[in-house]
Amino acid sequence: QSHVRISFDIPQYTMNVNLNGVLNLLEIIRKFCPKTKFYQASSSEMFGNCFDEDKCQRETTKMSPVSPYACSKLGAHTICANYRNAYNLFICCGILFNHESPRRGTNFVTNKVVKGAVEIKLGLAKELRLGNLNSMRDWGHAKDYVKAMCLMLNHDKCDDWVVSTMKTHSVKLQKPGKKIGKK
């Protein structure tokens, strides 16, 4: 379950999927195939509103989650570190910032905007409703993030790594109507 807002509606389900699911997999690896390399998709949401002095978030930045989703990801991240150290398992955690692809659901902002613009163009909708337009996000492409995941799993040593573009972008739309032929 990867939607922050929805995690407030279904916190127990979010924990079961994101934390207990990981714990179940780690137990199987520990008991039956300890040579397995495991990758955990952690989330920058684990940082909450904590930043280093230079306004960056890195592997050593304090983590202070502010949603059930972020708590579930921090729990999974922590149990991965515990299993890596206690059982000497090869477990890598990628602390991922936002990453997008055409496969991402329409309840996430980038595809929501595309879907809304198309619906307006086709006369199926008159407006597009969005949440906080002042939000700033570090957005990368899913293909680049998958490459980083592969590099982690092929590294000699397992560890935790932040995966980001190190650039933030506004959610504000810059004349989206022009792109679809609307004024």
Language-model features: where?
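Glycine-rich "substrate-gating" loop/helix at the edge of Rossmann-like oxidoreductase active sites
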Residues: 66-69, 96-108, 132-143, 165-167
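Glycine-rich, flexible loop/turn motifs
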Residues: 4, 53, 59, 65, ...
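Mid/C-terminal beta-alpha module of Rossmann-like enzyme folds, strongest
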Residues: 112-113, 155-183
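N-terminal Rossmann-like NAD(P)+-binding domain of SDR-like oxidoreductases, especially those catalyzing
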Residues: 1-99, 143, 153, 172, ...
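Alpha-helical substrate-binding/gating segment
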Residues: 85, 99, 111-127, 139-162
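A glycine/serine/threonine-rich, flexible loop-to-helix segment
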Residues: 53, 106-114
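Residues at or immediately flanking beta-strands
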Residues: 37, 90-93, 127-129, 160-162
